[in-house]
Amino acid sequence: NLTVFEMAAFNNHLYAGTVNARNGFEIWKTRAEGDPPYDWRRVLSHGAGRGPLNEVAVSLCEFKGALYVGSGIVNGGYHRKLNIGPAAAELIRLHPDDSWELVMGESRMTPQGARYPISGYRPGFNKFFNGYVWRMGVHAGRLYVGTFSWAQLLPYCPIHQWSEVAQKKIARMGVDWFVRNMGGCDVWSSEDGVHWDCMTRNGFDNECNWGVRQILSTPYGVFIATANVLAPDRAIQRNGQWEYVHNPRGGCEVWRGADPGEAGP
């Protein structure tokens, strides 16, 4: 365990999620009673049975009596130095009795038995490039989940060094197709953790919005802030040469979600 990456209060306990490149993230909890150091108990290990492909407990959020854990792999879903991934993120649901469910992710056998995604979605909400469940928040009785997608970085990736299978997949559709159709973060919401509605699949129609960095509930609606580093210029390739051009879609953005009965996003 290299880092306590995220913490949350839930069920009268403090929960801590770690980074563990060898075995996968761990979740620990404590009542924080008496004099420190406190008594901690591990409630999840080995990345919830997925190993290093769930390297990091990226985000924790309490929602309707359960603690939701969003996973990821460092560096956006591909830890190149340690050759972990690439792989998309998962979403786990922890209960007060330490039992857990796979909300979104890869079906598998675990020490606790078989786990299947109760939402029906594979890792990344069926989007391979969603390397993190980066941020979660609760508003108006719904859980909001924001991702990080690295698809918009494909033009800058050393694809020629990838496996033959991966190169063929990219070549079949073309890099531009992946950027256009897979670029930009996702935002999903649910009132029960099982049935999900997609708010955006492409960074609010901006593939440069590669991730959701904050979700905040307010009396005026839910506000969602993005990360967008492709600014003020963006490198593009023309006639085999790279050049920087002004990118009007670059720079972070803040979006407000309309509450039920209110018109517009």
Predicted segments, located by residue:
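Recurrent small/Gly-Pro-centered beta-turn motifs in extracellular repeat architectures
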Residues: 17-19, 70-73, 146-149, 225-228
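Trp- and S/T/G-rich repeat-edge/linker motifs of beta-rich repeat architectures
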Residues: 1-5, 9, 13, 22-58, ...
